C-alpha cells in the first residue's frame, strides 16, 4: 500500500513473512507447471521463474540468513529488505501469468 515500515517493526516482519510465503508458494506452483509443460510453454515458464528468482533473490537470502541465525549488517539487511515490494509485485505477476496459462 506504499507505506514505509521500520525494519524492526512487527508490521514489517509480518509483511516480509507474507511476501516470502507467497513467493515460495508461487515458485513451487511454477516448478510443478514446468514438469507438465509443453516445450513452448516450458520456455515461458522458465522466463517467469528467472524473473521471480531475480526479483526475490535478496529477500530469499535475508530469510535464509535469519533462518540460519547468521548476522548481517544493518545496512545490508536494509538494502535487502527494500526489495520486498519488487518481489511482491513480481510474485503477483507470475501468479497471474500462471493462472492465464
List PLM regions with ranges.
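Extended amphipathic alpha-helical scaffold segments
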Residues: 16-31, 53-63, 91-98
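Acidic-enriched, low-complexity/disordered segments with a strong bias for Aspartate over Glutamate
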Residues: 1, 35-36, 50, 58, ...
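Long, amphipathic, charge-rich alpha-helical segments that form helical bundles/coiled-coils
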Residues: 41-94
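Immediate post-signal-peptide N-terminus of mature secreted/exported proteins
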Residues: 1-40
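Long, non-catalytic architectural segments outside compact domain cores
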Residues: 1-10, 82-85, 89, 93-101
Amino acid at each position: 500500500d506504499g507505506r514505509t515500515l521500520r525494519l524492526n517493526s512487527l508490521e514489517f516482519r509480518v509483511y516480509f513473512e507474507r511476501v516470502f510465503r507467497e513467493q515460495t508458494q508461487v515458485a513451487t506452483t511454477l516448478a510443478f507447471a514446468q514438469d507438465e509443460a509443453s516445450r513452448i510453454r516450458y520456455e515461458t515458464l522458465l522466463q517467469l521463474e528467472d524473473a521471480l528468482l531475480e526479483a526475490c533473490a535478496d529477500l530469499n537470502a535475508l530469510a535464509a540468513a535469519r533462518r540460519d541465525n547468521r548476522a548481517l549488517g544493518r545496512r545490508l539487511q536494509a538494502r535487502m529488505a527494500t526489495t520486498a515490494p519488487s518481489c511482491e509485485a513480481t510474485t503477483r505477476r507470475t501468479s497471474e501469468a500462471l493462472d492465464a496459462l
